[in-house]
UniProtKB/Swiss-Prot annotation:
Interacts with RIMS1 and RIMS2. Probably part of a complex with RIMS2 and GTP-activated RAB3A. 3',5'-cyclic AMP binds at residues 422-425, 432-433. It comes from the Eukaryota. It comes from Homo sapiens (Human). Residues 216-291 form the DEP domain. This is Rap guanine nucleotide exchange factor 4. PROSITE patterns: CNMP_BINDING_3 (PS50042), DEP (PS50186), RASGEF (PS00720), RASGEF_CAT (PS50009), RASGEF_NTER (PS50212). It is a peripheral membrane protein. InterPro entries: cNMP-bd_dom, cNMP-bd_dom_sf, DEP_dom, Ras-like_GEF, Ras-like_Gua-exchang_fac_N, Ras_G-nucl-exch_fac_CS, Ras_GEF_dom_sf, RASGEF_cat_dom. Its main location: cytoplasm. Residues 772-1009 form the Ras-GEF domain. Guanine nucleotide exchange factor (GEF) for RAP1A, RAP1B and RAP2A small GTPases that is activated by binding cAMP. Seems not to activate RAB3A. Involved in cAMP-dependent, PKA-independent exocytosis through interaction with RIMS2.
Length: 1011
């Protein structure tokens, strides 16, 4: 699950604080908070709730820096671990010396290790943190107690020899080859084949429901059919099945989606092509249900027809959730030569979200889309490859888990979904360092074969151009197809272009200036690659470097060529610099007013161009546009209202100003209360982008003494964070009910939250139950749209790389993210403050209706906030309340929950958004997560060169914000004509409890835990 950034540190701190308590001191609310966090962790997703509950009682939290050794090979273990964040290297040495240890794999989020503490066998490997990592630790005595009590639950979850394998062999070492299923290398799976030996119960049931529904509603679809003189018994036609499915439910939006849903049945063998030759296709092909494989298959009884009517929509919802994965597997099982352009695009989109591939360039990912093979294995215990064998493939786990086994040492670790293995043997051309054994049934992998892997690397290198100076690379370009297929002149060869992979800032700028197309209009010239440079240059070439460089390029004169050639070069050079400056100024807009260097550059540049235009007629056509931009920015900067705009105290997002909401700028001033230990406060007036050091100075001036002062962020739950002196724009980073405190360092432990931070004690159900759900959703969307519109794209960049590195504010983004948390906690607060059961049921219905209307208005941010509020443990545990919710609303909620399913990197949400046209308000925390994923998975500099491929990927994500806002939000005419000042005021001034512990306590008082 994704949480908005503004709440992340607070919620993290809260559950960590609970884990830091001694087990005997943990309350039921503490355990609830820990349980909520752990059930989202992959390592625990298959754990029985009772077992996970016990882990919450005895586990400890560890936060380790990069390079820390947890234990060494040969040590006797004392703890079991699960990875919550970060990654760790598994190193093995044949001599037990750490000097010659080889890294055999990496443990990612969700992996667990250390089961050897059950019988005190020595550790089989050395474990070292690869990056800053968070772990859950369970001490040996507690882990043994869990094993004794919950052995039946844990046997299938731990690595052998403690876990249970289907083969029944002793998995402490590699099973004998004669007795263990081995993989036949390079046998491609045909898409028509099933991927399971036995269909799952739920897919069998789904097939039965669909067959009965067809026989009940359209019996003519299942009949004997003749084709080429051959009769096929009791079968259906692919196109007719797609038509029928689209008519049955609104949750099927396209024929492609329906194909994926039928493919789910085909993969399990519940539906089959009559000759076992084809995967499911929207064509005149014959398919037969499993029940119809037998002679005289029975028709559904009246009772079965009734059951089918009741279960059909739930079945459709289930298949719609499973369909995208089945469709992806179907594509990956096609021979690479048969994959269409659309197929390759679908695979490429999937690869963007696989952490093991995050460091690879776009070109390599696109090449991989063409060669990746889907591989599945039905039986646990199958050996994928053996230690010492030649490395022929690289694997990424899509589903399931594997054990990494070394001769004489047994299982050294377990790898899970998203982890990869086998790449080192390909890169180093070395034998396999370990054996890989399937840990469970039905494991799915992506496989890259060695020859394809090496060919891709060779092709990339062959298409790479390196510009060197003094024997050092200064610019690395990659040759790629230009995108426009054949030219109008009949040339069938695709044109090539060069994209920047890496380089020095100066050479990257020089390249983009040289490649600007002067014949294009300004709109056409906003080529996305140049746009990437303009958006991202602040990371590697701040304006203090860019502006002088642009001046130097503008005045540059060639040293060679005829006089005419020199004049032509100089003119075109000037025009290109002007073009880039126009785009740069358009992108930055009002933000330039806060940058003295940029303002001075613009004015001087305009004077230079004006002077040149008198002598060079060709520059005159660009002058008016430059003049317009410079004047507009200069006049805005000098306007009286821009000089010192005082913002609202405490940044209440529900500001009730009548005029249109204006973006907050770093130079705007804020009146802000900073509290002392005794809860008195002093009010300071400082710019929004002020650093903590300057805040301390302002507070010290008011208090008369500032020696040893620190500034502390205090949440309503009492979590305290000391702010660093170079932190900037901290006012908007507070949690909803958070406050700033100033105190000497020795008073830090004595700080306590203000009573007002606790939030309301009475709900507002009496007020908003009278308001229409549609009116509430509409006014929420109007307000969310105002907040979203104020977020500048560059704030996303500052947020990702750290605003302190730019000394810039991200106030508008902070407030928009805080709004997400505000709505989420509003839902939980209102339900937990409602003591009457029947009223709580009405509240659930109300919130589900509001969420549905937000979805209609394409306000996905509020939609997800409401759904996440309803799934908060303080609400989801209210079994009596949920039991009384009508089944219609339960179905709506189940459908909404399926959209926020985090599996496969929130694929359900991504597919939904891909179908929507702007304007829309996105699920902002996920967009932030995507940018952070790219940032943390790729270095900013490689060999002292800017990694421009990383810049391009981050800019591409940030640019989606521009796309979502590319059309104005047109108010609903029926809503806009209503005068709903009361609704407008209500949604802008939500009063919430944001302390999860308090909410859990209230929830337990409403419905105590059942014995």
């Amino acid at each position: 699950m994704v949480a908005a950034h503004a709440a992340h540190s607070s919620s993290s701190a809260e559950w960590i604080a609970c884990l830091d308590k001694r087990p005997l001191e943990r309350s039921s609310e503490d355990v609830d908070i820990i349980f909520t966090r752990l059930k989202e962790v992959k390592a625990f997703e298959k754990f029985h709730p009772n077992l996970l509950h016990q882990i919450c009682l005895c586990g400890y939290y560890e936060n380790l820096e990069k390079g820390i050794t947890l234990f060494r090979q040969g040590d006797i273990g004392t703890n079991w671990y699960a990875v919550l964040a970060g990654s760790l290297d598994v190193k093995v040495s044949e001599t037990s010396s750490h000097q010659d240890a080889v890294t055999i794999c990496t443990l990612g989020i969700g992996t667990a290790f250390g089961e050897s503490i059950l019988d005190n066998t020595p550790r089989h490997a050395t474990i070292v943190t690869r990056e800053s990592s968070e772990l859950l630790r369970i001490e040996q005595k507690d882990f043994k107690a869990l094993w004794e009590k919950y052995r039946q639950y844990m046997a299938g979850l731990l690595a052998p020899p403690y876990g249970v394998m289907e083969t029944g062999s002793n998995n402490d070492r590699i099973p004998d080859k004669e007795n263990t299923p081995l993989i036949e290398p390079h046998v491609p799976l045909r898409p028509a084949n099933t991927i399971t030996k036995v269909p799952s119960e739920k897919i069998l049931r789904a097939g039965k429901i669909l067959r009965n529904a067809i026989l009940s509603r359209a019996p003519h679809m299942i009949r004997d059919r003749k084709y080429h003189l051959k009769t096929y018994r009791q079968c259906c036609v692919g196109t007719e099945l797609v038509d029928w499915m689209m008519q049955q439910t609104p949750c099927v939006h396209s024929r492609t989606q329906a194909v994926g849903m039928w493919q789910v049945l085909l993969e399990d063998g519940v539906l089959n092509h009559v000759d076992q030759e084809h995967h499911f296709q929207d064509k005149y092909l014959f398919y037969r249900f499993l029940d119809d494989e037998h002679e005289d298959a029975p028709l559904p009884t009246e009772e079965e027809k009734k059951e089918c009517d009741e279960e059909l929509q739930d079945t459709m919802l289930l298949l719609s959730q499973m369909g995208p994965d089945a469709h992806m597997r179907m594509i990956l099982r096609k021979p690479p030569g048969q994959r269409t352009v659309d197929d390759l695009e679908i695979i490429y989109e999937e690869l963007l979200h696989i952490k093991a591939l995050s460091h690879l360039s776009t070109t390599v990912k696109r090449e991989l889309a063409g060669v990746l093979i889907f591989e599945s294995h039905a039986k646990g215990g199958t050996v994928l490859f053996n230690q010492g064998e030649e490395g022929t493939s690289w694997y990424i786990i899509l589903k399931g888990s594997v054990n990494v086994v070394i001769y004489g040492k047994g299982v050294v670790c377990t790898l899970h979904e998203g982890d990869d293995f086998g790449k080192l043997a390909l890169v180093n051309d070395a034998p396999r360092a370990a054996s890989i054994v399937l840990r469970e049934d039905n494991c799915h992998f992506l496989r890259v074969d060695k020859e394809d892997f090496n060919r891709i690397l060779r092709d990339v290198e062959a298409n790479t151009v390196r510009l060197k100076e003094h024997d050092q690379d200064v610019l690395v370009l990659e040759k790629v197809p230009a995108g426009n297929r054949a030219s109008n002149q009949g040339n069938s060869q695709p044109q090539q272009k060069y994209t920047v992979m890496s380089g020095t800032p100066e050479k990257i700028l020089e390249h983009f200036l040289e490649t600007i197309r002067l014949e294009a209009t300004l709109n056409e010239a906003t080529d996305s690659v140049l746009n990437d440079f303009i958006m991202m240059h602040c990371v590697f070439m701040p304006n203090t470097q860019l502006c002088p460089a642009l001046v130097a390029h503008y005045h540059a004169q060639p040293s060679q060529g005829t006089e005419q050639e020199k004049m032509d070069y100089a003119l075109n050079n000037k025009r290109r610099v002007i073009r880039l400056v126009l785009q740069w100024a358009a992108m930055y807009g009002d933000l330039l007013q806060e940058d003295d260097v940029s303002m001075a550059f613009l004015e001087e540049f305009y004077v230079s161009v004006s002077d040149d235009a008198r002598m060079i007629a060709a520059l005159k056509e660009q002058l008016p546009e430059l003049e317009k931009i410079v004047k507009q920015i200069s006049e805005d900067a000098k306007a009286p209202q821009k000089k010192h705009k005082v913002l609202l105290q405490q940044f209440n997002t529900g500001d009730e100003r009548a005029q249109k909401r204006q973006p907050i700028r770093g130079s705007d001033e804020v009146l802000f209360k900073v509290y002392c230990m005794d809860h008195t406060y002093t009010t300071i007036r400082v710019p929004v982008a002020t650093s903590v050091k300057e805040v301390i100075s302002a507070v010290a001036d008011k208090l008369g003494s500032g020696e040893g002062l620190i500034i502390v962020k205090m949440s309503s739950g009492g979590e305290k964070v000391v702010l660093k002196p170079n932190d900037v724009s901290v006012f908007t980073t507070l949690t909803i009910n958070g406050r700033l405190f100033a105190c000497p360092r020795e008073q830090f432990d004595s700080l306590t939250p203000l009573p007002e931070q606790e939030g309301p004690t009475v709900g507002t159900v009496g007020t908003f139950e009278l308001m229409s759900s549609k009116d509430l959703a509409y006014q929420m969307t109007i307000y969310d749209w105002e907040l979203f519109n104020c977020v500048h794209e560059l704030e996303l960049i500052y947020h990702t790389f750290g605003r302190h590195n730019f000394k810039k504010t991200t106030a508008n983004l902070d407030l928009f993210l805080r709004r997400f948390n505000e709505i989420q906690f509003w839902v939980v607060t209102e339900i937990c403050l409602c003591s009457q059961l029947s009223k709580r049921v009405q509240l659930l219905k109300k919130f589900i209706k509001i969420a549905a209307h937000c979805k209609e208005y394409k306000n996905l941010n509020s939609f997800f906030a409401i759904v996440m509020g309803l799934s908060n443990v303080a609400v989801s545990r209210l079994a009596l309340t949920w039991e009384k919710l009508p089944s219609k609303f339960k179905k709506f909620y189940a459908e909404f929950e399926s959209l926020m399913d985090p599996s496969r990197n929130h694929r359900a949400y991504r597919l939904t958004v891909a179908k929507l046209e702007p304007p829309l308000i996105p699920f902002m925390p996920l967009l932030i997560k995507d940018m952070t994923f790219t940032h943390e998975g790729n270095k900013t500099f490689i060999d002292n060169l800017v990694n421009f491929e990383k810049m391009r990927m981050i800019a591409n994500t940030a640019r989606t914000v521009r796309y979502y806002r590319s059309q104005p939000f047109n108010p609903d005419a029926a809503q806009a004509n209503k005068n709903h000042q009361d609704v407008r005021s209500y949604v802008r001034q939500l009063n919430v409890i944001d302390n999860q512990r308090t909410l859990s306590q209230m929830s337990h008082r409403l419905e105590p835990r059942r014995p």
